[in-house]
């Protein structure tokens, strides 16, 4: 799995940096986008192996970005994982029903994130 590229879409620079550092230390390549609009454009241009998508972003929400990516033949097959700090009951079920391929709770677990990402890549 080494060398696979993960696109991190999050409007919070600290979250992006921590996620990037953990993934790169584990052998993944990374791309970063500071919002949904930039994330969609980067996914269309680079076609990463997996997208970690924040849900709440000011320019384009995670579910809105997901819809655009799933409608585009270049990006429709990329696994897209909801990556959120929301702790509302039923979130995971709602995100999966919306079409996300998985769900990760923030803050990330530095120990668990690489294995979680590998699991999404194998699914």
Predicted regions mapped to residue ranges:
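Charged docking surfaces used in two-component/phosphorelay signaling
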Residues: 17-25
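C-terminal output helix
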Residues: 108-117
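Receiver (REC) domain active-site loop signature in two-component systems and cognate sites
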Residues: 57
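Active-site beta3 strand of CheY-like receiver
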Residues: 46-52
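Short hydrophobic/Thr-rich beta-strand motif most characteristic of the beta2 strand and flanking loop
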Residues: 27-34, 42, 104
